[in-house]
Each structure stands twice: as C-alpha cells, then as structure tokens.
Regions:
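Alpha-helical structural signal in soluble globular domains
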Residues: 11-15, 66, 70, 125-137, ...
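Flexible loop/turn connectors
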Residues: 158-258
C-alpha cells in the first residue's frame, strides 16, 4: 500500500466505525478477482457483505460490472463519466491545473510533470489540467507517465537529469517525490535553488522531507467521510437524488521545495 492508501484508509476505517460498519480490504483490482473466501468479492457474492468503496477506477472496470449486475451498493472514489454510479473525488483536472498554474506563477519555464499509469482516469484528468494551465505559456512542459512508485519516479527523474536540467518537477504524489529528491541530489543539484519540486496529496511524510515539500493538498478526512455517508445511504435504500457525485477542490500548500 502507498502512503496515500494508508492515510485514506485510516479515515475510512474511522468513519466506518462511527457507523458501526466493519471494513474488509480486498486484493481484487480492476482487472481480476480472487474467487475464494479470502476476498471481499466472494463475501459480497455470498451475501456476507453489504457494500463497497472502490479506491481506484479505470474505464471498463470489471468490479463495477460485477457490482451492477448483482445490485450491490457501491461508491467509487474517483471521477467517473457514468451518471448511474455514486462517486466521491478530488477534482483531478484542477489538481493538474492548479499545480501547473502555481509553478508558472513562480516563474518556472521548464517543468516536468511526473504522473502514474495513463490508464487511470485521475491521471488523464491531471494531465489535461496541467496542459490547459501551461498551454498559453512560453516554455517546455513535458508529461512523463509511469511514475507510479518511488523507484519509477526516481528512474524517470534520473533519466531526465542525465539529458536536461528542468526548472521544476511536478510529481503526482508526495511519496513518489522522494525518488525525485534523490535523483536531483545525486545529480548534484539543490532543491529549490537549482530545481523546484511540487508534490500532490499533502501526506504527513511531506513535512519530513528536506526541504519540506510544497504540495497540492487534498482533504482526506472530508472525502472519506463522504464516501462512508453515501455508501451507508445506499445500503439503507435511500434516494440520493442529485447527491450522487461529490467533488472536492484542492489547494496549494507552499513550503520550502518551491
């Protein structure tokens, strides 16, 4: 589990406990299911669990099909195009837009944006926001997909720094920025004197990086509470009306890395 998952799950467990709900984590993902009693979807299919919160979403997600076919209540954490599903999300377009605009406003003209896998809707939206923020500015603005772990972010940043010296790295995840910090320091550069770094998430460890990382914040607690509230209402058979989609806006927290 990433640090993002740890923080989000902490709040989900806390609010679920307040609603007297028990939480089971499942190893199944958008591509496959484990069809034995160790998996949450086995419990769902056999009437031993009441609902689901999905913490990731891709187009044509097998889990969504499974849940819809069986009429099982579920909430997706993520922005979705399907009006028939209930979702809670950070405004990922605005994450990219806000981060890009902030760095341009700070005077950076060569920015490398490191994001995770392209197949995730959240990453596509962040890239679109970043492109819209930087599209009318003079400079170099590159998108680097595949930075979905600390090590991969390190390797991508290292590869960039072997060829170029950007003004700033915008990293889609504070934890992954650890790898970027290492690559910058190994290349003999200083943060932020030579190269700035902006992260996303505002996870607690960001305060312990040196220098402390500037980040695009997301309100984990409010989003977790909304996920549990909506799922509880669905389980109870309540009509949500126009409340099927909840989107939370991010904000930039400026620290020493920019």
């Amino acid at each position: 589990l990433s640090s993002w998952h740890v923080v989000m799950l902490k709040y989900l467990f806390s609010y679920a406990r307040m609603k007297n709900l028990k939480v089971i984590m499942t190893p199944s993902n958008s591509n496959s299911f484990i069809s034995d009693e160790t998996d949450g979807y086995y419990l769902l299919e056999n009437g031993l669990a009441d609902g689901v919160i999905l913490l990731e979403h891709v187009y044509d997600d097998l889990r969504v099909k499974f849940l819809k076919e069986r009429g099982i209540p579920f909430v997706i954490f993520g922005q979705v195009e399907d009006d028939d599903v209930c979702s809670v999300s950070l405004d990922n377009y605005y994450v990219g837009y806000k981060g890009g605009s902030y760095l341009i406003g700070r005077g950076y003209k060569y920015i490398e944006f490191l994001v995770g896998e392209e197949r995730f809707d959240s990453n596509k939206l962040r890239v679109k926001g970043f492109q819209d923020a930087t599209g009318k500015s003079d400079g170099i603005f590159n998108i680097r997909y595949g930075a979905n772990t600390v090590d991969k972010a390190y390797r991508i940043a290292k590869g960039v720094l072997e060829e170029e010296k950007p003004d700033a790295f915008f990293v889609s995840g504070d934890e992954r920025a650890i790898g970027v910090y290492r690559a910058i320091q190994e290349a003999g550069y200083s943060i932020p004197k030579d190269i700035a770094v902006l992260g996303v998430d505002n996870i607690p460890m960001g305060n312990y990086l040196h220098p402390r990382i500037s980040t695009v914040d997301q309100d984990f607690e409010s989003m977790a509470r909304e996920c549990v509230e909506l799922l509880t209402k669905l389980i109870d058979g309540e009509d949500l009306g126009n409340r099927k989609t909840s989107v939370f806006l991010p904000s930039v927290i400026e620290r020493e890395s920019t």
